A protein has these predicted regions:
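Short, charged/polar "capping" segments at the starts of alpha-helices
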Residues: 72-75, 95-102
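Non-cysteine beta-strand/loop elements that form the S-adenosyl-L-methionine
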Residues: 84-95
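Active-site beta-loop-alpha junctions enriched in small/polar residues
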Residues: 37-39, 68-70, 92-94, 118-121
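Basic phosphate/pyrophosphate-binding loop/patch that engages nucleotide-derived ligands
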Residues: 98-120
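Short beta-strand segments
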Residues: 31-36, 64-67, 90-91, 153, ...
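Conserved alpha-helical substructure of the radical SAM core
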Residues: 1-78, 82-86
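Accessory C-terminal segments flanking Radical SAM cores
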Residues: 130-201
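Acidic/histidine-rich catalytic cores of soluble enzymes
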Residues: 115-131
Length: 201
């Protein structure tokens, strides 16, 4: 996918949490997901990010992590345990996913597994055109547009869609006035909402 492989810098992360804090105060921030295209646990300050995120959203809101399991060992699970994230493990590498799931389950952190690439495949809103013939994901309503979810990209831009691999759905930046961030359908006939397996509400 056409995204540069970089880590979010700490200042951008703090600004993103300020945006989250605004929506927590508004009463509309019901959960937070620390995930993305790529492996979130590769970030050198990942455990700190989880801790800071939990401090902002409190213990009563869902904090979700997705991982391919390569870095989720007993030590990582132990470090994450105080913050009670809900961890989903991808089954792309079963031989790595199994021990990761054991480590997360032992700490009460395993929320589920992800085998969507095999049993609920999609084409990343047209970004993976070669997957289009294999799309088997259900034609559900897009929760990003329906519930007002957004994605913060690595550079702090705020996007409408988690499947937007090139920034086409950007509506602003984490340092913008939150009231100006309006999510909307995006893309053209080949990339974006029109090419997605989900329905625009």
């Amino acid at each position: 996918l056409p995204r540069e492989k970089v880590d979010m810098d700490w200042d951008t992360f703090v600004a993103a949490l300020d945006l989250v804090r605004f929506f927590v105060r508004q009463g509309t921030q019901t959960e937070l997901s620390l995930t993305g295209i790529g492996e979130s646990m590769l970030h050198p300050r990942f455990v700190e990010m989880v801790a800071e995120s939990r401090a902002v959203i409190g213990m009563g809101r869902l904090l979700t992590i997705t991982t391919n399991g390569l870095l989720l060992d007993d030590a990582m699970a132990e470090a994450l345990e105080p913050f009670k994230p809900a961890i989903f493990v991808s089954l792309h590498r079963p031989e790595k996913a199994a021990p990761a799931m054991v480590a997360a389950r032992k700490r009460g952190l395993l929320a589920g597994r992800n085998a969507a690439f095999a049993d609920s495949a999609f084409n990343w809103a047209g970004h993976q055109e070669n997957w289009t013939p294999m799309v088997s994901a259900p034609n559900i309503k897009c929760e990003f547009l329906n519930a007002g979810w957004c994605v913060v990209l690595v550079d702090g831009r705020v996007a409408t869609c988690c499947l937007d691999a090139d920034g086409s759905s950007v509506v602003g930046h984490v340092r913008d006035d939150p009231e100006t961030l309006t999510l909307k359908p995006w893309g053209d006939a080949k990339i974006g909402c029109s090419a997605c397996h989900m329905q625009v509400p």
